[in-house]
Amino acid sequence: MSIKIALAGNPNCGKTTLFNALTGSNQFVGNWPGVTVEKKEGKVKGNKEDNITVVDLPGIYSLSPYTGEEVVSRQFILDARPDAVINIIDATNIERNLYLTLQLMELDRPMVVALNM
């Protein structure tokens, strides 16, 4: 059984940093929004069965897309139906991040909220 986990959140909240930590990848990170412009997939390191895939999605503020990057993220979350979503939230600006969190909760899929400082 394979498991697919999506990393979702606002731009520049730490999604790619978490992706790199979980997968052992070395994807480029920057301290500004818009660094990740396409989805990236990797296997969780240390998982002997090699059956857990993590998907790093471009940053989005809501499930109502305005940019190409937001369309990529929205389509993956709604159409690919990941087994779970890790919603990364910038703990320094929680209020701005919660709109997306509420939308993700309404999808009724397993979700973890991860606060990042």
What are these regions (language model features)?
Residues M1-G68, D79-A80, A84:
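Conserved G1/Walker A P-loop phosphate-binding module
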